[in-house]
Swiss-Prot record:
Encoding gene per record: proA
Pathway: Amino-acid biosynthesis; L-proline biosynthesis; L-glutamate 5-semialdehyde from L-glutamate: step 2/2
Recorded family membership: Belongs to the gamma-glutamyl phosphate reductase family.
GO CC annotation terms, alphabetical: cytoplasm
Entries under InterPro entries matching the protein: Ald_DH/histidinol_DH, Ald_DH_C, Ald_DH_N, Aldehyde_DH_dom, G-glutamylP_reductase_CS, Glu-5-SA_DH, GPR_dom
Main localisation: cytoplasm
Function: Catalyzes the NADPH-dependent reduction of L-glutamate 5-phosphate into L-glutamate 5-semialdehyde and phosphate. The product spontaneously undergoes cyclization to form 1-pyrroline-5-carboxylate.
Name by which UniProt lists this protein: Gamma-glutamyl phosphate reductase
Length: 423
């Protein structure tokens, strides 16, 4: 297979399909999504068998347990995948909505219309459910998509792709509106990110190495986040019970997600009241604590052992594991300075009962999501009311934070007149 010619053909077909999707009605798009859901259910056994092939190959190739877990489509995960698709049907269609329409002194009306981006390339690893999520969000937002999943999920992705094509045909939409790259050759990724004439934006989902490579090499705009080094700061005026509950959940509710807290900052004024109890809870859950000198000394005096010395690199690390960096800070100035220096710009939280300090934290912390008295684990498109999300962006232009339907669109200016001429 000539990869360059193959990817160019996918790009040409996607560009042509994107024009049909841009003019597709909401009912046609919803009909396609419903038909895809029906096809997935009809081919459930075949998809699960294909996934089992991927799992068997993964074990033979030495994939670790975490990757195998992300790769696996259990019956419950399959049902959740289809239900998530059906929830997208119920979301409001953003396309064609005109906002900010106003008369100008000349008599013309000026506003903004929500429009699709065009062709979206999505590059991801392991999880076959991303194939369904990404296809559904792109279709609902009037875009065409080229999906390049990980080689470890090739069989399940191809089985799912056939269901997507079936649903599109049933709705009278081009079955090239969603195309799954059917080669495992890594050169396909290089081609996908190198053709702005066919692809309008790339969304990479995966490990830091993949996203760095895409960001460095792409000739197409990229919506991305490199990692999720999230912080929770317990202020000196925090409610202790609330602080312990939120900080514990932010770390232990799930370890391998990008919105899990990786660094805990505690104000010096409240550290003796909150840190020993919280450290004990973390250790009971099997969390390794890496602390600054003050934190280690405080816990030793409280009779709690096991906290190891934090290195400088720990402050900027996304552990994705039961490991937590802990630092005692002088107060909110120190906390904000630390966060803005080491954070990846994903999600940060403050626990405090002081409204003024909470507002200051919201204003001065430079991340895509900033929270007050809530777990960082809430940084999620579903929790924000976006429905499903295509990913999370820590960039400051276009989409920022969880990227849902609206993040896959743009706006164009519309001008309405009645024979108006400029004098």
């Amino acid at each position: 297979m000539d990869i360059q010619q193959y990817m160019q053909r996918l790009g040409e077909q996607a560009r042509q399909a994107s024009r049909a999707m841009a003019r597709a009605s909401s009912s046609d798009k919803d009909k396609a999504l419903a038909a895809i859901a029906g096809a997935l259910r009809s081919h459930r056994n075949a998809i699960l068998q294909a996934n089992q092939q991927d799992l068997d190959a993964g074990r033979n190739n030495g994939l670790d347990a975490a990757l195998l877990d992300r790769l696996e489509l259990t019956p419950d995960r399959f049902d959740g995948m289809v239900e998530g698709l059906e929830q997208i049907i119920g979301l409001a269609d953003p396309i064609g909505v005109i906002t900010d329409l106003a008369y100008r002194p000349s008599g013309i009306q000026v506003g903004k219309m929500r429009v699709p981006l065009g062709v979206i390339g999505i590059i991801y690893e392991s999880r076959p459910n991303v194939t369904v999520d990404a296809a559904a969000l792109c279709l609902k937002s009037g875009n065409a998509a080229i999906l390049r999943g990980g080689s470890e999920a090739i069989n399940a992705n191809q089985a799912i792709a056939e269901c997507i094509r079936e649903g599109l045909r049933e709705a009278g939409l081009p079955d090239t509106a969603v195309q799954v790259v059917e080669t495992t050759d890594r050169a396909a990724v290089g081609e996908l990110i190198s053709h702005p004439e066919f692809v309008d934006v790339i969304v990479p989902r995966g490990g830091k190495g993949l996203i760095e490579r895409i960001s460095n090499d792409a000739r197409v705009p990229v919506i991305k986040h490199l990692d999720g080094n999230c912080h929770t700061y317990i202020d000196g005026q925090a409610n202790i019970a609330k602080a312990i509950s939120v900080a514990y959940n932010a770390k232990t509710q799930r370890y391998g997600t990008c919105n899990t807290t990786e660094t805990l900052l505690v104000a010096n004024a409240i550290a003796p009241q909150v840190l020993p109890e919280l450290a004990g809870k973390y250790q009971q859950a099997g969390v390794e604590l890496r602390g600054c000198d003050k934190a280690r000394r405080l816990l030793t005096e409280a009779g709690i052992t096991g906290m190891v010395e934090a290195s400088n690199s720990d402050w900027e690390e996304e552990f994705l594991a039961p490991v937590l960096a802990v630092k005692i800070v002088d107060g909110i100035n120190d906390a904000i300075e630390h966060i803005n220096r080491y954070s990846s710009g994903h999600t940060e939280a403050i626990i405090t009962e002081n409204y003024t300090l909470a507002r200051r934290f919201l204003t001065e912390v430079d991340s895509s999501s900033v929270m007050v008295n809530a777990s960082t684990r809430f940084a999620d498109g579903f929790e924000y009311g976006l429905g499903a999300e295509i990913g999370i962006s820590t960039d400051k232009i276009h989409a920022r934070g969880p990227v849902g339907l609206e993040g896959l669109t743009s706006q164009k200016w519309v001008v309405l007149g009645d024979g108006h001429i400029r004098l």
